[in-house]
Regions:
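Small-aliphatic-rich amphipathic alpha-helix that forms the alpha element of a beta-alpha
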Residues: 46, 65, 92, 133-144, ...
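A glycine-rich helix N-cap at a beta->alpha junction
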Residues: 194-211
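Bacterial N-terminal signal peptides that target proteins for export
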Residues: 1-8
Length: 211
C-alpha cells in the first residue's frame, strides 16, 4: 500500500509540474485609449532603436500597444489600421521570454501558441533575443485574393500600417522599437505552428530603451 501511495504521489506531482508549464490564455485589460502625447509630437519622436533594457512590459502597456497596432476600434469590428478590402489578414504573434501567443483582437486576449522562449528565432540580430517583446506579423493568404505579386503588395502594405501604429505608440510612451525583415522564417514558422498558407511578413522588437 505504501508503494502504491508513493506512485500516486509521484504521479500527482508530475502532473502538477506539467500543468504549471502549460501556457494559458492571457486576458488583456481594456486598452487605455485616452491620453498619450499629441500626434505631431509622436511623429517627431518616432525612431528605430536597437538597444533594450531587460525590463518586461506591463500587461497594460502590452494591451495598449496591441490595440494601437491592430485593435478593434469600432462596433462593426473594423480596426485601428486599414487593410485592403477589409480582409484583416494580418495576425500579430507576441513572442516573449515566457512563450509565444497570438493576439485575438476581437476578444482582447492572447491565445497561447508555444511555451518556449522563441525570441532567438524572431530575428538574426543579437538584440532580438533579449528584447522583452517581439511582434511577428503573419499574413493569412487564404483571406487575400489576386496573384502572387498582388498578395505580396497587399500584405506588405497592410503590415506596414500596423508596424507604423506600433512605432507611434512607442514614441508616445517612451518605448524603444525597431521593425525588421530579417527573420528565420522557416524555423520560426515551424515553432509557431504556422500553416503553409500563413506567411511571416515582418517582425518588430519592443521594449524599454537601454539606459
Amino acid at each position: 500500500m505504501k508503494k502504491q501511495g508513493l506512485v500516486w504521489c509521484l504521479a500527482a506531482t508530475l502532473a502538477t509540474a506539467v500543468g504549471a508549464q502549460e501556457l494559458k490564455p492571457v486576458i488583456l485589460p481594456a486598452p487605455q485609449t485616452d491620453g498619450g502625447r499629441p500626434l505631431m509630437q509622436a511623429l517627431k519622436d518616432r525612431k528605430s532603436t536597437r538597444e533594450f533594457s531587460g525590463e518586461k512590459l506591463p500587461v497594460q502597456v502590452l494591451a495598449n500597444m496591441l490595440w494601437a497596432g491592430f485593435g478593434v476600434n469600432r462596433p462593426d469590428g473594423k480596426r485601428t489600421a486599414p487593410s485592403a478590402m477589409n480582409w484583416q489578414e494580418t495576425e500579430i504573434y507576441v513572442v516573449t521570454a515566457d512563450g509565444a501567443y497570438v493576439y485575438d483582437a476581437a476578444k482582447n486576449r492572447l491565445e497561447p501558441v508555444a511555451k518556449e522562449d522563441l525570441r532567438n528565432l524572431a530575428g538574426t540580430q543579437s538584440y532580438v533575443a533579449t528584447a522583452p517583446v517581439n511582434l511577428v506579423y503573419v499574413a493569412d493568404l487564404t483571406k487575400v485574393t489576386g496573384d502572387a505579386g498582388e498578395k505580396e503588395l497587399f500584405t506588405g502594405a497592410d503590415t506596414g500600417f500596423i508596424a507604423q501604429n506600433v512605432y507611434l505608440y512607442c514614441a508616445s510612451e517612451g518605448l524603444a522599437t525597431v521593425v525588421r525583415a530579417s527573420v528565420d522564417r522557416e524555423a520560426l514558422g515551424k515553432a509557431l505552428k504556422l500553416k503553409a498558407t500563413q506567411k511571416i511578413v515582418l517582425a518588430q522588437s519592443v521594449g524599454y530603451p537601454k539606459k
